Amino acid sequence: MRTPLLSLENLSIYLNGFKGDTKKLVSNININIHRGEFVALIGESGSGKSLSALSTVGLLPSAIKASGTGKWLNLNYDLAEHNSLKMFRGKEIGFIFQEPLVSLNPLHTIGKQIGECITTHAHIPNADLKHKVIALLKDVKLDDPERRFNHYPHQLSGGQRQRVMIAMALSNKPKLLIADEPTTALDVTIQKEILDLLHSLRASYDLSILFITHNLKIVKNLADRLYIMKEGEIIESGKTEDVFKKPSHAYTKDLIEPKIKIIKSRLNSPKILLSAENLSVKYKGPRSLFRSSSKDFCALNKVFLNIKLGETLGVVGESGSGKTSLALSILKLIDYQGDIKLHLPEPRLRKKERLKNYRRNVQIVFQDPFSSLSPRLSIRDIIGEGVISHRIFSKEQVEEKILLALSRVDLDKDTLERYPHEFSGGQRQRIAIARAIIMEPKLLILDEPTSSLDAAVQKQI
């Protein structure tokens, strides 16, 4: 019998509460990964899959503790001892995090950040270091790597940033690559490119891969074996082909073929709530000392739009097609040309107050809940910020509204004193939805709200 590259035995993970209580998040799971194998760990938001992966390299938050035994080839180690895991981190095990924009330092170029990953584990001259970084960028198929070397994270698209994260994870030629939801919030075209890239790198770098995802279907043709997690437990495992052909658990069946009930709008009003005419958005091209002007980019070109009261309108398009620009212009968060009108009675207000009243009636849930939620605010402050700013409710009424909004998105009141980084991606999106609906808007704009959610939670949303 082959010796696994990595084994996790009886892994349990606990959250230490504010009042000294302990909550079990992951319960006695066992995972084996062999050399050259592609293993997928699948589960819905909050199932414990990302925490399980973080525990392998000692990256759990301070309030969360792990117990159990890890085994790297023939070396046993205690999963509770964070210091014993440092020897694997970045060298033997590379890690791709879920949100590249958050993981990358906005103040340093990508060349410098990848270089730091290399020099942490090896001494290498600067000239050789640059060549090695550029070679890594070529390996991950980042276009024009010599130029991208000096770019900052904000100058790259979501897919490009994810390629940079992959390059960082591969920088010390690890034996195991852990990819935590690497295609979350990317459109289907870019998703396929990233998955194809990981497939090719698996062969060229002789990698084992632990791929964490909520989307069972995207690993159907990639993974050798699957582990299905639910509520902190592994409920099913096996070869990918066997699980897809004959799933034994009802939850797995629902992941493979989620049954989404289509609910028709109960409101069938002919009244137009919002109209947009000749709506155009242009972004200025880059300027420099040597070029006084450059071609502007047209994101929207003379768009006409009517949204009726009670109507659900879908806007479909791939990355870069202008969907988000349309949403931001309707919210009046960016400059636009054309006319946008909300057909509601307008109180007599000053211009600044009119805009505030407009945005009370038009709310948005952004695509990436991690970057749209302030890391410095508690969940109570995040959800209540909007209603507090309007100063039309008492302190007691605000508290009632916060609790009601929280219950509507199926989160309990214990979450109110916690912070965004303590939640899974799906839970953060629920918080973002609660922040929007607490305002009781007439129009709710959802910018790809389910792209980062698993099939079961997508169905719930």
Each model region followed by its residue ranges:
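Conserved ABC ATPase "signature" region
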Residues: 128-147, 397-414
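A short, proline-enriched helix->beta-strand linker immediately N-terminal to the Walker B motif
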Residues: 171-175, 438-442, 458
